[in-house]
Amino acid sequence: MVDLSIEIAGIKMKNPIMNAACPISRDAETMKLLIDNGVGGVVAKTISVKPAIVPRPSMAVVDRGMGRFYYLKTLKPGDVRITPVDAGNHRFIHAFLNAELWSDIPAEHYLEREYPNVKNYCRERGVAFFVSIGYKPEELALLGPKVEKAGADAIEFSTHYIGKDYRPVVEAAKALRESVSIPIFAKLSPFTPNIPDLVKDLEKVRVDGIVATNTIGPALNIDVETGMPIVGGPYGYGWMSGPALKPISLAVVAEAARSTKLPIIGVGGITRGVDVIEYFMAGASAVQICTAALVEGFSVFQRILNETVTWLEKHGYSSILDVKGLALKYLKPEPRRVWAKPPLVDEKKCIGCGFCQQVCDYDAVHVEESGGGKRLAVVDRTKCYGCGLCTSVCPTRAIHFEE
């Protein structure tokens, strides 16, 4: 039996999967649905001193979810080929835009009605209750004590998106820390500058954890049939989330993990159990999910939980903590190598689909029939540049680097 339980900043959770602060946690009823669908911690949608004026439309899938992908088609026994298709299936959505801002409901409504309601539900079911607030130091100092009194286990705080100066984050953290006694978590932007120095300064003001990252932007997507932007923010801009954000957020998580012992909650582009594993390997102690739930529904949390357990069992791990930080030892400041190293082909795994041949820009990989009639990938070592693209698309990991 795999153990998914964690503890962050003294808060015990039955599993590390949480929702991110967004419309799926806009009130007590939606937060109860999140709890019923298996989250280990629930995060209430961000509030501030004044209700937001939210542009409409406020959310949209980029390119209507159309993504070019490939499936394996068996033409005859031993003859498997890659076949391109276009699909609007939610599993292939690559990006999502929002112009949501924070909640357009007054903070007093949450403090008086929503938080007490969901707090009791959390206590009954052993789920941690986080509240997200923003944005300026004086606003956090005002809201923080009220949120603590309303029963939050911890506070996640955001600042408005920063440029080259991270001091607003530290100033906000200091103001909140001086006003509450419960754990506080600083939510970082994808392009937060100088993360090592920032997390050290956050440690000095006694922040209890990091959340990485927020959405990225401004971003624009245009409906070519109408010429209009897909969301209704100023200039048509929104903020991007979804799978396209994951590599950026992972980099922030890893850089923070190399710089601090504070727990880090990874956010951005999680749609599968392996994404949870990836964030943990980068140093995360928990994860948050929003976009996948907006598109797939609340059941996504249980699916991702199940996939996480299955992966851990298959790979012989007994706890989610066993994989935490495993990738950090490979994240070195120098390049892995600067010379061509051709990949190897495991003939037992190769199914001859031809994906490696299709993506090779150096004409170095070809699928050929072997003596027994089986189609196999063959690497021409004299042409191979060692770029690695073929290894990243192989569905069976047959073509690989021997490190």
Which residues are covered by each model-predicted region?
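Catalytic cores of alpha/beta
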Residues: 29-34, 140-149, 192-205, 253-259, ...
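Glycine-rich phosphate-binding active-site loops on the catalytic face of alpha/beta enzymes
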Residues: 44-50, 154-162, 209-219, 269-270, ...
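Iron-sulfur cluster-binding cysteine motifs and their immediate structural context
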Residues: 355-372, 378, 389-403
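Active-site beta->alpha loop and helix N-cap motifs at the rims of alpha/beta catalytic domains
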Residues: 69-167
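Glycine-rich beta-to-alpha transition loops that act as phosphate-gripper elements at the mouths
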Residues: 22-24, 132-137, 188-194, 262-274
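C-terminal helical cap(s) of enzyme catalytic domains, especially alpha/beta-barrels
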Residues: 51-79, 221-238, 292-317
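Glycine/Thr-rich beta-alpha phosphate-binding loop at enzyme active sites
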Residues: 95-101, 105, 157-168, 198-262, ...
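Active-site-adjacent beta->alpha loops and helix N-cap segments on the catalytic face
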Residues: 29, 53-58, 107-117, 121, ...
